[in-house]
């Protein structure tokens, strides 16, 4: 590619930096002048002491069999990839981060090819014109190819949009025409008729500016519009921003039209008898799918016949796993599988998936890709030689599928039929490295399973939809994100705000409809035992109250530190308050500095402790909580260091459990107790030992090969009264219906995590009514967290929150601390700015 070709294809917005950009690009094109960041293509760097598996052909290659070993390709280090990304970003600054990353991945990190791909296939930010057609061969990883009908392709030609802006600052006053055509007419109509909230959707338009525009309406013609904008000191660029918004709305309208067409096609296929599948004969004869599961199977078969990917979003506990197993059995029974299938699951559900497949369909041959690095290396060697053959299903975890460059390469290259993602809400953020890795898996079709498709905001749902149907949404993703990120901010006409939000809701529902199947337990499980949810506001113990109020008083009297200190800003302060609200031993009050000096001396002389400098050891102990100090000393066999039992049992929540647990045990109930914090679970363990209750425990540190044994033991052994679980590790994908009581010791900021946790026992197979206890420390920051969680739960019903998740979390923290510490408005704003700076400039 010549320099002139590059210059010709560059966007107008990048022309001012063309010379430096071409210089940056040239170093990647001409080997003899290449920058040192580019390794010579004649050799492949190897990490000393590590062997490479046989390299597999990339799916971009021209060969027919992507599993055939090919010549070794250039392998770049992470640093080299970062440098190439920076070079591409510098050359193409007007393209989205994800678009640049995807283009580099598609072109094997060739910067010149990546830049060409961007300019031919992707829209720069704010660009609305047509794009040149790409000459690159598409990859068969689900991003292009047979995941839906060609009639559904989201080409830019579908929405005719003008490349010319409606306002040009070089136009003279005499050139202002009263005659309007095309885009000007649409912008003029919008500026005359848009509501306050609609005007606020235009870039740079605040509520104050939008009100000023409404005050000078109506506009008689184009020149009147421009003159009145000038009279209220608003730039004509505002008209271009309005044009940009209208074009985005047109793009989304085109997508909605396509979605409606897809719904019509699906309905026609169903009415013509597509689907109508009964329980596959390959399923175990003694097991029977529920009626709604048969419907789910038929939905999957219709989607398969229409070559459409989908999201099975049944509420937690409705047996999504079983429906997928039945679908895979249907494919095998009818000879429809074109290759092996991949199922990607959280570590905690790996063994459960294997057990359920064996139980429901023993005919499906399962290969579990798991184990040590050496074991996986040997398996990769076999896959490199034979491909994914000899089995129907390859089962692995989210962690392992992207664990090493070799594994990412393997799943990008080897062909798969279906890839199924369990707990797919893990893909809700399209900016993460995990999302970028998983979207390159080379599968013909995709199915996502999630019981909570909506958690924080609409954009998370859009991330899932873009993952499941990438080509359908890819070229419009920035427009979709922009529109769904808008939120009605007016404090005025609430009917107007509600109408704006209702429009967003209806858009989201129409986009979702072809791709998502969601049923609720209350609608399909008529015989499921009832669930009673109780919020128990528990008073703190007397000493706990003293500690909590001391902390609040300290920060209330040092508001400057709260609002400005980067080290002890918002979240850290809130966490200290949460710790004391849960248990005093999560902070340090019992062990004095003098105690720590003595402990430091003993540890320095201990053969099992590596450090010998007493001062360093003291400083390390000084930042620990009482319980951490106790654990440290016991770890190194100083068993004389103890915390009295009365202090371990001294928290408001434990005092409540002193009444609740004996009553539950006497009545024959069994309990799941969840906490977000493993340190809190450590203290609960000590409490249960003191109270002589039998228990077992599962958290993120529990070995994967042990987890299923723990679940089996609890379900089969009535003597185990309490199962301790961390909310994240133990709250997804496991069946614990032997319990009928769930205690949420400390609630999560994200209430959907708690809902997942409680559904471990309230699900298919439960025979008894279920009771959920949420413990909230009275008059503490936990009451504010509960209110924030209840607001988020409205998403599931209304789909109304359209803010970015990170910003929403930050505002929650600011609001909670403002209330807890009595900050005034200026201090609240200062804290908000401090958190903004902290997020923008994280510590290195």
Curated annotation (Swiss-Prot):
Biological processes, Gene Ontology terms: defense response to Gram-negative bacterium; DNA double-strand break processing; positive regulation of innate immune response; positive regulation of transcription by RNA polymerase II
GO molecular function: ATP binding; ATP hydrolysis activity; chromatin binding; DNA binding; helicase activity; nucleosome array spacer activity
PROSITE patterns for this protein: HELICASE_ATP_BIND_1, HELICASE_CTER
Residue ranges, compositional bias (Low complexity): 1-23
Entry keyword Nucleus: yes
Stretches with biased composition (Polar residues): 30-42
Binding site for ATP: 314-321
Function: DNA helicase that possesses intrinsic ATP-dependent nucleosome-remodeling activity and is both required for DNA repair and heterochromatin organization. Promotes DNA end resection of double-strand breaks (DSBs) following DNA damage: probably acts by weakening histone DNA interactions in nucleosomes flanking DSBs.
Species of provenance: Drosophila melanogaster
Protein name as annotated: SWI/SNF-related matrix-associated actin-dependent regulator of chromatin subfamily A containing DEAD/H box 1 homolog
Family: Belongs to the SNF2/RAD54 helicase family.
């Amino acid at each position: 590619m010549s320099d002139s070709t590059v210059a010709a294809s560059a966007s107008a917005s990048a022309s001012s930096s063309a010379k430096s950009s071409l210089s940056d690009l040239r170093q990647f094109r001409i080997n003899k002048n290449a920058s040192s960041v580019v390794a010579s293509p004649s050799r492949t760097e190897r990490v000393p002491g590590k062997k490479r598996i046989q390299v597999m052909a990339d799916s971009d290659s021209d060969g027919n069999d992507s599993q055939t070993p090919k010549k070794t390709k250039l392998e770049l280090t992470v640093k080299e990839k970062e440098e190439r990304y920076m070079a591409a970003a510098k050359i193409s600054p007007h393209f989205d981060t994800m678009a640049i990353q995807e283009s580099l991945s598609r072109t094997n990190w060739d910067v010149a090819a990546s830049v060409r791909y961007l300019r031919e296939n992707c829209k720069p930010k704010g660009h609305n014109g047509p794009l040149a057609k790409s000459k690159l061969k598409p990859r068969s990883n689900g991003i292009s190819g047979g995941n839906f009908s060609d009639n559904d392709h989201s080409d830019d030609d579908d929405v005719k949009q003008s490349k010319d802006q409606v306002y040009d600052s070089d136009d003279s006053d005499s050139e202002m025409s009263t005659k309007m055509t095309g885009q000007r007419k649409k912008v003029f109509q919008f500026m005359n008729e848009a509501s306050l909230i609609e005007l606020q959707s235009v870039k740079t338009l605040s509520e104050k500016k939008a009100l000023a525009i409404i005050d000078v309406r109506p506009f008689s013609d184009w020149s009147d519009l421009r003159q009145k904008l000038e009279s209220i000191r608003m730039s004509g660029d505002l008209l271009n921003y309005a044009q940009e918004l209208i074009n985005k709305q047109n793009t989304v309208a085109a997508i909605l039209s396509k979605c409606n067409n897809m719904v019509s096609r699906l309905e026609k296929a169903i009415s013509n008898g597509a689907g109508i599948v009964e329980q596959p004969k390959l399923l175990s004869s003694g097991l029977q799918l529920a009626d709604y599961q048969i419907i789910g199977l038929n939905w999957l078969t219709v989607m398969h016949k229409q070559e459409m990917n989908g999201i099975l979003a049944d509420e937690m506990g409705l047996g999504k796993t079983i429906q997928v197993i039945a679908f895979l059995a249907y494919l095998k029974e009818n000879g429809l599988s074109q290759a092996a299938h991949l199922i990607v699951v959280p570590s905690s559900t790996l063994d459960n998936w294997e057990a359920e497949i064996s139980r429901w369909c023993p005919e499906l041959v399962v290969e579990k890709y798991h184990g040590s690095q050496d074991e996986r290396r040997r398996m990769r060697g076999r896959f490199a030689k034979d491909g994914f053959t000899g089995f129907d299903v390859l089962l692995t975890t989210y962690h392992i599928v992207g664990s090493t460059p070799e594994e990412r390469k393997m799943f990008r290259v080897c062909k798969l039929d279906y890839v199924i993602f369990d707990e797919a809400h893990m893909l809700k953020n399209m900016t993460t490295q995990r999302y970028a890795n998983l979207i390159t898996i080379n599968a013909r079709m995709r199915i996502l399973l999630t019981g909570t498709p909506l958690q924080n905001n609409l954009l998370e749902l859009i991330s899932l939809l873009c993952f499941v149907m990438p080509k359908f949404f890819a070229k419009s993703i920035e427009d979709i994100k922009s529109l769904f990120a808008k939120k009605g901010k007016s404090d005025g006409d609430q009917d107007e705000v509600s109408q704006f939000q209702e429009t967003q809701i209806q858009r989201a529902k129409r986009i979702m409809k072809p791709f998502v199947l969601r049923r609720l337990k209350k609608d399909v499980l008529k015989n499921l035992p009832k669930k009673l949810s109780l919020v128990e506001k528990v008073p703190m113990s007397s000493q706990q109250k003293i500690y909590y109020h001391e902390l609040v008083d300290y920060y209330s009297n040092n508001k400057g530190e709260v609002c400005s200190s980067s080290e002890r800003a918002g979240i850290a302060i809130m966490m200290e308050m949460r710790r004391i609200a849960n248990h005093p031993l999560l902070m340090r009050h019992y062990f004095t500095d003098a105690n720590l000096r003595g402990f430091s001396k003993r540890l320095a002389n201990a053969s099992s402790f590596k450090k010998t400098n007493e001062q360093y050891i003291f400083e390390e102990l000084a930042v620990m909580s009482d319980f951490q100090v106790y654990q440290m000393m016991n770890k190194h066999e100083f068993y004389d260091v103890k915390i009295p039992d009365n202090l371990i049992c001294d928290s408001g929540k434990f005092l409540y459990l002193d009444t609740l647990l004996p009553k539950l045990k006497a009545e024959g109930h069994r309990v799941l107790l969840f906490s977000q914090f493993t340190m809190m679970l450590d203290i609960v363990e000590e409490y249960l030992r003191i109270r002589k209750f039998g228990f077992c425990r599962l958290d993120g540190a529990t070995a994967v090969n042990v987890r299923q044994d723990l679940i089996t033991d609890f379900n089969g052994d009535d003597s185990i009264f309490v199962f301790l679980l961390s909310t994240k590790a133990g709250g997804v994908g496991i069946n614990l219906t032997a319990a009928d009581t769930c205690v949420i010791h400390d609630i999560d900021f994200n209430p959907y995590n708690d809902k997942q946790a409680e559904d471990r026992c309230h699900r298919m197979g439960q025979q008894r009514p279920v009771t959920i206890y949420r413990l909230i420390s009275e008059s503490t920051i936990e009451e504010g967290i509960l209110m924030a969680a209840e607001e988020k739960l409205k998403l599931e019903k209304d789909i109304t929150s359209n803010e970015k998740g990170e910003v929403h979390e930050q505002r929650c923290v600011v609001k909670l601390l403002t209330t807890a510490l009595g900050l005034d408005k200026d201090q609240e704003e200062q804290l908000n700015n401090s958190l903004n700076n902290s997020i923008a400039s994280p510590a290195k």
